[in-house]
Amino acid sequence: MRYAVLVTGPAGAGKSTFCASLITHAQTIGRSVHLVNLDPAADKFEYEPTIDIRDLINLEDVMEELEFGPNGGLIYCFEYLLNNLDWLEDELGAYEDDYLIIDCPGQIELYTHVPLLPRLATFLSTSLNFRTSAVYLIDSQFMQDKSKFFAGVMSAMSCMLSLGISMLCLMSKMDLVKDKKGRTKREVGRYLDPDPNLLLEDINQGTNSKFNQLNRAVVSLIEDQNIVSFLPLDVTSEDSVNTVLSHIDNMMQYGEDEEPKVPKDMDDGEFVAPPRSYNIKLIVRDR
């Protein structure tokens, strides 16, 4: 079974940093994991991509030859990729029982305005038989501006509904969240599990009264759908990265269909059985 994780979110949310941290942790625990770059404008990586869209098409070349702007050029690059999926299939063909981390561009119009990323997710799931999921990152600094936070929740909801696959929402850069301006863990919790009713009054106090009705409509939509909550991500904490990886594994049912791997030395008579493990139940009696 093959697995693919689409790493999405707006520009500056920390997607590439998250990819690097996830790969480092996965390699530490012995997993075969590879980075796939789908950003034709990317130029720096902590890990060299195993598969790179720039080997197929480059944004700078498109902008120069077709005189497109950055966003138009990016959409053209993705359309070119989707018209040449045989290239991607050939690139992915050698990876069996592997875990692919797919770093996506930060232009959210790829899955909110035009159905490019959803088409790619469908291709991976149906044509190539990948178990596919997604993560969506927003910057923890959104918590400093409640209107911006609401916009982030809406974009996460849009991505989730557009992709049509299981998705985990992450509040990135939690290592930058300091206990200042009176912010407490309880207040941070209101953002991780958005409670629109608690936030509505604060927004209405700080915005023009003309927007109050719009704010109530947005809050009502978020509350009625109730599909977005955030897991805190601190890439400087191995425990935090491990927690995120565990949630991704659960979404894709990672490893449930894997066949036991036979040690190479078994046929040579050198195999030594590992110690037997026991399931010990602790019974606590009331005194």
Curated annotation (Swiss-Prot):
Keywords: GTP-binding, Hydrolase, Nucleotide-binding. One of its GO terms (biological process) is mitotic sister chromatid cohesion. Pfam families: ATP_bind_1. CDD domains: GPN3. The record marks N71 as: Stabilizes the phosphate intermediate. SUPFAM superfamilies: P-loop containing nucleoside triphosphate hydrolases (SSF52540). GTP binds at G12, A13, G14, K15, S16, T17, S172, K173, M174, D175. A motif (Gly-Pro-Asn (GPN)-loop) lies at residues 69-71. InterPro entries: Gpn (IPR004130), Gpn3 (IPR030228), P-loop_NTPase (IPR027417). Small GTPase required for proper nuclear import of RNA polymerase II and III (RNAPII and RNAPIII). May act at an RNAP assembly step prior to nuclear import. Heterodimers with GPN1 or GPN2. Binds to RNA polymerase II (RNAPII). Belongs to the GPN-loop GTPase family. This is GPN-loop GTPase 3. The lineage of its organism: Eukaryota, Fungi, Dikarya, Basidiomycota, Agaricomycotina.
